[in-house]
Amino acid sequence: MNILIQGGGRGIGMALAQRALAAGATRLFITARDPLAAPAYDMLAPDDRVTFLPLDVTDEASIMATGARIAGAVPQLDRVICTAGMLQQGDIRPEKRVADLKQDNLLHLYRVNALGPVLLARELWPLLKGDHRLHFAAISARVGSISDNRLGGWYAYRASKAALNQLMRTLSVELAR
């Protein structure tokens, strides 16, 4: 089984990578912005089934390069799990009021949380289609639910996760064709 874990260098992604190896993954691709600095690197790199790849989900050229590297290594992917995501970093913080919105922050969260996974799917398309059973998952958040928003706030994060949910639903429809 060939598996890609986008954002597998730490946290949830690292735990999923460990589980994938324990379950017998044949090839495991793990992406991180800086793989050598990722906590998972020292733990998982010695396993010859593991390949760490640099990936900046906000950079389309990086997404394309990662897709090309994986396509050059395996004929198909059986599992893709996108765990990279962001709520806050630096001056990007969850907004409490609409007056707190900043366009650059909103766009950055869209790039990380919503666009990264679907652009990666675009680059991996030949490895996703075919006669094999594929599972493509992206970690979202309950706050991405439109119907469950009773508290307000967190505009950029909520919107980016809602966009991710719609993009993944649309991708699933196309993959089923």
For every predicted segment, state its role.
Residues A23, A73-V74, G90, E123-H132:
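A short helix-coil junction within the Rossmann-fold of NAD(P)-dependent oxidoreductases
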Residues M86-A114, K129-R177:
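Catalytic loop of short-chain dehydrogenase/reductase
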Residues V57-Q76:
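Conserved Rossmann-fold cofactor-binding substructure of NAD(P)-dependent oxidoreductases
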Residues L21-A40:
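Conserved glycine-rich Rossmann-like NAD(P)H-binding loop of the short-chain dehydrogenase/reductase
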Residues L44-A61:
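Rossmann-fold cofactor-recognition segment
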Residues I3-G8:
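Conserved N-terminal Rossmann-fold NAD(P)-binding element of oxidoreductases
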Residues A121-R122, R169:
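A short, exposed helix-loop element centered on a Lys and neighboring polar residues
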Residues G9-Q18:
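N-terminal Rossmann NAD(P)H-binding glycine-rich loop of SDR-like oxidoreductase domains
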